[in-house]
Regions:
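Enzyme catalytic cores with a strong preference for nitrogen-chemistry domains
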Residues: 1-339
């Protein structure tokens, strides 16, 4: 469960500029090496040796800063106008069937004013808290409104059927660019039960509110939104740089949908955003992150936050996303050089 790797601490620091070259693990290695150099410097009795260790430490940090000045990507078209809709639906009401109409109405009311001034409108993970087959009239009406306005909707929704008992945590595209994506990397005990044959007996005993999803295939058709190919991830998938790399080099920008309401008012939603920022930096792509209760944000290819919403408020976060093409060394080679 690689949630808080050491490298994430350097997103806003010079060593973070190594992420496009060696990923989060390479950045973590540089942190450890820096600490070792500093300890050796402070504990060396020979002043000449101290100068040598200081020079090596300075070379590492200045080298990282210099590598960050190299551009590996370039624009792949005009900027897209993006609206991220944060519904702020409380967890106790999210899956309540009696609250479904209220939830859908909230998202529609927040989105309608954005249709005339957006290329893409993004809703969070399972923003539509019902199976796709159960809300097809609503989705069809939303698609008609989107096509008339010339906008794409991207939203999280569970898909599957009770007949087959196969369900997916999914993203659908509604409007000009219909699309479907099934989450590949599921959260253990939250979205599926590991070792089902051995552990199923205690699921009710521990009383964990869980879903029972099936992972999507490793090879899925590339999603499009705003006329550009986009790399998708859902919640926990943003923790894995290897998952983000799957959509490259074709994807010119990234979307991450999440529901961090489970974490409530803890450090975890902010940590999740920090993780997503480093993903954008690793592969040199803008990232639009839509969450139910925050923290929703637009992040540029340098991992910098360009727009950000508050927590625990219904809000629309507006901004521009610049599609980019090109491959960073990390996007090309992955984690293996650092590991």
């Amino acid at each position: 469960f690689p949630w808080l790797a050491l490298g994430y601490s350097q997103t806003d620091a010079p060593l973070g500029q190594l992420a496009p070259y060696a990923g989060v693990f390479g950045v973590g290695w540089a942190v450890v090496f820096s600490a070792g150099l500093l300890w050796t410097l402070l504990n060396s009795a020979d002043w000449r040796a101290r100068l040598g260790w200081l020079g090596l430490l300075a070379a590492l940090w200045l080298g990282a800063w210099g590598l960050g000045r190299i551009a590996w990507v370039e624009p792949a078209g005009p900027a897209l106008r993006v609206a991220i809709v944060q519904g702020n639906v409380t967890q106790d009401r999210k899956w309540n069937p009696d609250a479904l109409d209220e939830t859908l109405t909230r998202y529609v009311q927040l989105s309608l004013p954005e249709q005339s001034q957006s290329d893409v409108i993004i809703w969070p993970e399972t923003a539509i808290p019902a199976l796709l087959d159960e809300v097809r009239p609503f989705v069809a009406a939303l698609a008609g409104a989107a096509q008339q306005a010339g906008v794409d909707y991207v939203t999280g929704i569970p898909t599957g059927s009770w007949e087959t008992s196969i369900f997916h945590n999914s993203i659908i595209g509604v409007g000009r660019s219909p699309g479907l994506y099934h989450k590949r990397r599921l959260l253990p005990f939250g979205e599926y039960l590991p070792l089902r044959g051995l552990l199923l007996f205690f699921r009710d005993w521990v009383d964990i509110p869980m879903a029972d999803f099936t992972p999507g295939g490793l090879e899925q058709p590339l999603f499009r939104a705003g006329g550009q190919p986009v790399g998708l991830s859902i919640c926990f998938e943003a923790v894995f740089g290897s998952e983000i790399r799957r959509a490259l080099p074709e994807a010119t920008w990234l979307i991450n949908l999440s529901n961090d309401a489970w974490f409530k008012d803890s450090a975890a939603p902010h940590q999740h955003l920090q993780i997503a920022r480093l993903r954008a930096l690793e592969v040199g792509r803008y990232l639009a992150r839509a969450t139910n209760t925050g923290v929703s944000a637009i992040v540029d290819e340098q991992g910098r936050i360009k727009a950000r919403g508050p927590q625990f408020q219904a809000e629309v976060i507006r901004g521009e996303v610049q599609p980019l093409r090109g491959l960073t060394p990390y996007a090309r080679f992955g984690d293996w050089p650092a590991v």
